Amino acid sequence: MNLHPKLERFLMTSCDQFFSAFPQKRPAKKLLEDCLIISHRGIHDQREIKENTMDAFVLAEEKGVYGIELDFRWTRDLVPVVVHDPDLERVFGMDTQTAEHDFESLKGLCPSVPSLHQVVERF
């Protein structure tokens, strides 16, 4: 299902706000000690280090996380690239759709967007 990008962002934000209003109880210490940390889109602050970039994944690796979770979208020439949203607006401030670009033009526009192949090869 493809949602309009603005509707998708609205729904994601609404869901985040809903669940943040109902915090969960802190797990028992033993459960926390035994858990494996999976980094959601790497470790990022959205200012210096953007989500789903090699920098975010390298930082997660350096911090010793067990694994990383990532998202991917297809470029016009069917190269899977590691980007969460269908557009680059929220993360990179660019009003353009990932699927409108071939991989080379996307890399020229936004060099920090890696291909799925690059991420799998590195990690």
Question: Across the structure, where does each feature detected by a protein language model lie?
Answer:
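Phosphate-group recognition and catalysis centered on beta-loop-alpha active-site segments
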Residues: 1-123
